[in-house]
């Protein structure tokens, strides 16, 4: 769902940081 997409984005940002 939309929440899954948002969590995926957050995970990607955390990986960059």
From Swiss-Prot:
Predominant location category: secreted
GO biological process: one example: defense response
Alphabetical keyword list: Amidation, Amphibian defense peptide, Secreted
Short name of any one Pfam family annotated for the protein: Antimicrobial_8
GO CC annotation: extracellular region
Residue numbers carrying Valine amide: 17
Keyword Acyltransferase: no
Cell location: Secreted
Keyword Secreted: yes
Distribution of this protein across tissues and organs: Expressed by the skin dorsal glands.
Superkingdom of the source species: Eukaryota
Name of protein: Uperin-3.7
Organism: Uperoleia mjobergii
